């Protein structure tokens, strides 16, 4: 919904109505709760529908996460009446939500690549999910390659999916409407990161850079919730505290999530804003930071780095390079206040012009019309064969846990005991 909010007024001015179904493998509601939100018809995935499709995918009992993603994708496609009332369908890559419309090929389709489950599993692997991740990589590559039109938000992600699929992938950045900023705040004298404490968001790169700076290292506030690090029940914050005890909790201070208004106030008061991600399809907080008027440092691993000209409207450093980040921090700490203000103002002008909603809306509408025209000229047929079979429900099994027969009983009992113990003492 957030992605479309800034575009809807321009869509409606062209007579385009937008309907959105919100949902995923982990998000559904008892009822669809239809509502009109800022001119968009919004529904929520129905839990009973998700559960019904989950039961039909029992061939993936050994891969419950994949099973739930496919179930959610088909449940949402069914709830949308398989796209029958729509001129064009836009489906997200995350959670395999694009798979049903891609393989059914019954409506014009644009796949919007915001960051797929398979991509995330590469940049943030979790113990025990390796088999699911490998399967997701294969399915995403094959099914995105079969989609009619493919879009994403940054040049780097377009290049990634083009290399994986051999298809043309267009890059259209998100739209941005500048909001009124709060009254000017005195500089906090501290750096600021907005985002989850997560491996691919780059907290370890920041810690390493600050460690290299020693006594010159600035204080940095990190605003965002904790996530797992490498294993379920783990903590990224705990990992960083153990790996960098002199930095995490001393030089980098974690804060819980705050409101968007508080984010804007913090960004406007920061000495600098930082996006240290080792990978990010785009990272919208970079745009918000640039709009604040304060200098913004962005890793080349984040797609939003497309907007930055180093030293002109912000600062860049190579993805994962702590030494380079330390050099940029040193550069900012020794730069004049006047120069930093000039760079911040240039960043504000960049996001106003490059992400102008009317301009972005025209590009997206042109892509929708191209998909509709292409579909009319070259109708597609549903995918069959192995790929089609893999992505659709299979014949029900009388014993969906039969895959456990391939494991030694001793291992099963040991794992069950350990899992029970963890639940008791949690």
Regions found by a protein language model. Give the residues of each.
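Short hydrophobic beta-strand element within catalytic cores of glycosyltransferases
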Residues: 295-298
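C-terminal amphipathic helix plus adjacent low-complexity
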Residues: 353, 358-426
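Conserved acidic donor-binding segment of nucleotide-sugar-dependent glycosyltransferases
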Residues: 310-311, 315-322, 331-337
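Membrane-proximal helix-turn-helix segments that form the acceptor-binding/catalytic region
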Residues: 117, 130-150
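Aromatic "clamp/platform" in nucleotide-sugar-dependent glycosyltransferases that forms part
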Residues: 278
